Structures are given as structure tokens and as C-alpha cells.
Amino acid sequence: MRLIATMLAGLALFLAPNFVRASWDGAAPADEPRLVAALFRSSWCGACRVLEPRLEDVREDYDGAAIDWVRFNFTWGERNGLRDIAVAEGIAPLYDELAGRTGFLVLMDRETGQVFEIITMDYGRDQIREALDRWLVVTERLESVEGQ
């Protein structure tokens, strides 16, 4: 019941009259999932070593779900090529803001640039699943409303 109330509250936030579509570095292709899960990681990051096994376990449950999983690996400090990935995914502004930081997964709306939630090592597997489920519902509802 609490999960449903949380989802409805989140949906209300995004369907409010002041909802504004942000401009991005080009429109995302229509076949790309709206929900983006962007992992900022490196091999030397302690938080990454805690978070990543949890994400991998949970990710298996979401094969075929409308989630675009993107991974930015800052292990060698090289940023060349990573921004190209961000541009291709339509999330360059997010990358520009967070490049070099590690140890978290950003759940965001590709079309508006809205960051829904930042998942850290403090999240357990169940909390990660709840976050993914919550924002999948929101993005699906946004698409259905916008498609009318």
C-alpha cells in the first residue's frame, strides 16, 4: 500500500501543470527506453565494490525491461570516449555534471533530463528493486499520457 502511495505521489509530481520538457543534445531515438540507469564507477572505488554486486543481482530481474543501462568507467581517469557514450545516449548534460564522481547509479528520464533517484551503496537489493519498479511505472505512465 505504501509503495502504491509513493508511486502515485511520484506520478503526481511529474504530471503537475508546471511540468516542462528540457532540451537535450538531440532527441533520443523513439525505440530507446525512457528510463536510464547510468552507473558511475571505477575499480578503485570502495562504494562501487559494495554497490555493483547488488546491481548485477537485481539487473538480471530486469532483462527486457524498458531500462537503458549505461556504464561510465573512470578507472584509468580517462574521460575521452566516455562523453561520446553520453552524447550517443542523450544524457550528455548528466555526464558533464557528474563526470569523475563514482559509486552511484543515477535513475533519470532521458526525455526531460529529470533525475529521479540516485542509488548508492546504502541501498540494499530490495530497495534497488523498489526504485527501479517505481520509476518504471512513472516513465510508462508519462509515455502513455504524452502519447494521447
Where in this protein do the model-derived segments appear?
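Non-catalytic, surface beta->alpha helical segment in thiol-disulfide oxidoreductase systems
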Residues: 99-143
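A short beta-strand-turn-helix
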Residues: 19-35
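Hydrophobic membrane-insertion alpha-helices, especially the h-region
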Residues: 2-19
